[in-house]
């Protein structure tokens, strides 16, 4: 491995597993795959303690935009509190998008962040906007690189038809 890949591979990440990755859920196999890949590449994912649903589908249930933002802000605040300095990594595209959009909106708007923090205060939390939100694919490509990813391959999957998981 290159020095950059070695250094980045030893980095820890605050992991947001998401509801669909839980046992018996639609993407439980996805979590199994992510864990196997991270173990092989020596990436350390630490689940955000007491994480909650990202609220990606809350609008369908009549929830407000602020409710969805507070759900994500809570996860990000928990990551900042318990896993400081670590990027938040999600594997589900819907979870990643919900968390990333919330971060962007709360960082850009002090009044919106104040509203979210007022709700979080009940749980003794405050969102500060420090944690960066990233997708697992981003981490693999940007932090490790394609060359480092190809080295541990035992059997190439050339010609295999695959489908992405969209959340």
Task: Go through the PLM ranges and name each one.
Residues 3-167:
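Iron-sulfur cluster-binding electron-transfer modules in prokaryotic oxidoreductases
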